[in-house]
Structure formats: structure tokens, C-alpha cells
Amino acid sequence: MFLKKAMLIIDRGSREPEVREELGAICEVVKKKGGYDFTDYCFLEVLPPFIEEGIKRCVSENVDTITVMPYFLYPGMKLKESVKKCARLCHEMRIKVIFTKPLSYHFILQNLLIERIEDLKSKMNISSLNADCDILVIGHGSSDKGARTAFEYTVNGIVPFYKSVNFCFLELDRPNIEEGVRNIVGKGTGLLIVVPYFLHKGAHTKKDVREELYSALEKYRLKEAHITEHLGADVKLVNLILERAREAESNIV
């Protein structure tokens, strides 16, 4: 008997239209490459479609199972809240659900950081060797210790390739962005390349990170600094989603 399957990607949520565009693009490629009968996304908070609506959309397509991808870079509080809420709703609706692992702890994320840096160097015609570049990776930050551990795992993976690799957080953890810039200045900086470790072009990447960063750069009089693009709707993330899905689905009898 042929079983119909859906993939539902749960994101934190954002008011920025670019976030919906990126998630829509990812869902489209996931459906094609993963062989799903239906793919969609929903949000934990901020704006609809919320999780309940996302599940109902899948159910309306008469699928037999829903594979749920908690689309988070860290195993923090928001991820746990998403899984708990989705599990409860699926139980109430009597629909079979399979949860994947989040995106964290995978070499693809390290490759994406390197790719964003190389893209920037190419775009800006930067000829400096990687051995002369100081990298500052900016994460969101979380009160969950597991989130920090996962973030540091990814950042540490690119340490061998650059003059120095440093990290800081937008909020909820230390060092903050100003402290991150100060730490680099204190060690003697080469060419500074800043990587915003965010999935989407949301309010944080468009405004918050840049405001904090530019303020710190001005304070410490750093004139030669460049900021890369965020992670975005990259096919590498699609491949990671599908790998996580296969891992989870293969464990179900």
C-alpha cells in the first residue's frame, strides 16, 4: 500500500517577508528532492501560520505521516517548545508524526560559514589570504547551555582555516557584539570578516546585528571590516533537512 507523506518545517517565526520567501523556496526543493507528497512550513510564534494550522494543512492533503523538522540552529528552549506543542496537537488529531533532529552538530553548517566568507571575498575582490583574516561569528544567543555548546561546535570547526575565529552573541549570552569586537582588537586585528549565524533575512540580520556591530566598530575605530550574508535558502540546508528526515524515518518500523 502506497503511503502519502508530508514534511512540515517549524520555524520560530518572523514578520519579515523575506523569511516566508526563503522557507517557501526551501519547501519547494525539499518536496522535489525528498519525494514528499506535500511540504509546508509554519511558525511557533509571532505570526501565522502557526503549528496547528500547519498540521491541519498536512491532514487536509490526506497524508498518512508527517515528518516534522524543527528548523532551528540550536537545541534551545524554542525548539523544545515547538516539538512539545506539535506532538500534543498530532496526538489530538490522531496523525502519525516523525520528528527529526534539528540542524545542529553537522559539518554542513561549518561548510556554509566558509562558503559565506568565500562569497564575500569574491564579491568584494578581497585578496587577503585566509591566514590573514579574523573571523567573528555572531549567533543569536540563548539561556540554554545546550544551544551555546552546539554553536561553539560549529564555530570551532572553521578555526584551522583562518588567522583567528571568534564568536559573540546578539543577546541572552556573552560575549555580546561589542565585547566580541573588543576582544579581536585587543589581540591585534587583520582583516575582519563578520558572519551572522542566522537562518533568515529577518529583523535581527537586517537591523539588530548591524546596528550593534557598526556601533562597536565605530567605538573601537575599526575601519576595515566586512559582513557576509546569512545562511539563507541554500541547497546545502535542503540536503541537511533531507538527511535528518531520512535518519528519523529509517528508525520507524
Residues of each region from the PLM?
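Active-site-proximal alpha-helix that buttresses catalytic centers in soluble enzyme cores
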Residues: 1-253
